[in-house]
Amino acid sequence: MASQPLEEPAESQASDELECKICYNRYNLKQRKPKVLECCHRVCAKCLYKIIDFGDSPQGVIVCPFCRFETCLPDDEVSSLPDDNNILVNLTCGGKGKKCLPENPTELLLTPKRLASLVSPSHTSSNCLVITIMEVQRESSPSLSSTPVVEFYRPASFDSVTTVSHNWTVWNCTSLLFQTSIRVLVWLLGLLYFSSLPLGIYLLVSKKVTLGVVFVSLVPSSLVILMVYGFCQCVCHEFLDCMALPS
């Protein structure tokens, strides 16, 4: 008994939403279809035709009678404006505020007209649309539901990338070790070369004549070899230049 007074205002509010706020006639599925303007106000198609006939609006544009917002008419036809699908569903169900469930409640087709009709006309802007998506429980066999199945996918390209990365690391380490060894050897040879003269003199004083002569003659012999190499290189260049000249 206590719920009856609460249900009556709800029913009256639902019936008010089913009426055009200009002519106060009830919407229907024929001449008075609820059309949604870009400002989200609802007007029946018959009133929109009257507004166009009065010439109050520019060509191809409808001025909202409530907020004076201009709505462009696609193809200059009122029928091209989106319908308020919520009102149409309510009219299809009898206009008593009952909810009609579609045949497939898990699917919802979203189109620009559908989204425009889903926006409540009481809001001044339509920047936000909240869509609640609920997970549907699907029937499955007991054996599959009791045993969790986890599948891991490992692409073959990942193994090849790992192998290439490992080989590249080994190659870098080997190259670095080789370069370090070459540098150490060059430094040792340079130290031995520049210290060969005092070392040879020391060996001669120590009466180690053979080694002393070898170390003492290392620097002069290397200088002589470099001079001979440079002289031979100059002679070869001159000879090649003479051969290249046309006869």
UniProtKB/Swiss-Prot annotation:
Broadest EC class assigned to this enzyme: transferase
Tissue specificity, per the record, is: Expressed in the cortex, hippocampus, cerebellum and spinal cord, but not in the heart, liver, kidney or skeletal muscle.
Keywords assigned: Cytoplasm, Membrane, Metal-binding, Transferase, Transmembrane, Transmembrane helix, Ubl conjugation pathway, Zinc, Zinc-finger
- Is Ion transport among the key words of this record? no
Topological relation to the membrane, as annotated: Multi-pass membrane protein
Q: Name one GO biological process term.
A: protein ubiquitination
Q: Where in the cell is it found?
A: Membrane; Cytoplasm
Domain comment from the record reads as follows: The RING-type zinc finger domain is required for E3 ligase activity.
| Annotated function | E3 ubiquitin-protein ligase that mediates the ubiquitination of ATP6V0C and targets it to degradation via the ubiquitin-proteasome pathway. Also plays a role in the inhibition of TLR-triggered innate immune response by mediating 'Lys'-48-linked ubiquitination and subsequent degradation of NF-kappa-B component RELA.
Q: What is this protein called?
A: E3 ubiquitin-protein ligase RNF182
> Which species is the source of this protein?
Mus musculus (Mouse)
Taxonomic placement: Eukaryota, Metazoa, Chordata, Craniata, Vertebrata
